[in-house]
């Protein structure tokens, strides 16, 4: 465990083993959400995270699950912000000044580039890549790269999937699923039916699951 100078830790906050938190970060302070009235809420941080200079992470609110959760092995670069009630998975990278608003979910291995902004309640699927200064207003299915303001889908994160051990066949299936969803002019229900016909490979199931769990609608 490493805490550099001028780190502020409020609470209740639970921090796991092997974390490194750099100077001027504020961890577990009250949320500025106007609904928050001082109720007991908490922040949970897993193991082996690197939290760089000036990062802010707020606790949850009773209007949600009263918890903000950060998984393990994440890298939050300088001045990144994690709002109240967020759930950040494992192995996530938030580049300098990336910011996620309240109630956001970020899946494992996702990357948020510098100055990316994520609207409240948005879900970012696993292995997504969000481009620099993108504004994400709707949910992003697994494996997708998204750029722009508002963020629009570009392709699948091939390089990221290779690094994570997905086979060439699985990456091809993910690309086929992406094209059915975004490049064939199909309605969403039609695209889901067509993707289902690609089989039950875990990559396809993961892609479908991230679509079906969407509550804000997916980027289109």
Show which residues each predicted segment covers.
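Structural signal for interior beta-strand "rungs" in well-ordered beta-sheet cores
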Residues: 1-152
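Terminal amphipathic alpha-helical/low-complexity segments used for targeting or macromolecular assembly
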Residues: 2, 18, 24, 35, ...
């Amino acid at each position: 465990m490493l805490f550099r100078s001028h780190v502020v830790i409020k609470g209740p906050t639970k921090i796991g083993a092997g974390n490194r938190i750099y100077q001027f970060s504020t961890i577990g302070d009250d949320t500025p959400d106007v609904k928050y009235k001082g109720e007991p809420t908490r922040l949970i941080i897993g193991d082996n995270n690197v939290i760089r200079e000036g990062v802010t992470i707020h606790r949850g609110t009773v209007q949600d699950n009263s918890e903000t959760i950060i998984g393990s092995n994440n890298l939050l670069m300088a001045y990144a912000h994690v709002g109240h009630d967020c759930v950040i998975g494992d192995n996530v990278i938030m580049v300098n000044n990336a910011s996620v608003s309240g109630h956001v979910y970020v899946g494992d291995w996702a990357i948020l580039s510098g100055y990316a902004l994520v609207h409240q309640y948005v879900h970012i699927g696993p292995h997504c890549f969000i481009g620099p200064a993108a504004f994400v207003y709707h949910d992003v299915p697994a494996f997708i790269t998204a750029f722009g303001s508002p963020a629009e889908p570009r392709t699948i994160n091939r390089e990221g999937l290779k690094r994570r051990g997905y086979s060439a066949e699985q990456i091809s299936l993910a690309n086929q699923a992406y094209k059915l969803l975004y490049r064939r002019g199909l309605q969403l229900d039609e695209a889901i039916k067509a993707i289902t016909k690609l089989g039950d490979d875990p990559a396809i199931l993961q892609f479908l699951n991230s679509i079906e769990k969407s509550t804000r609608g997916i980027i289109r």
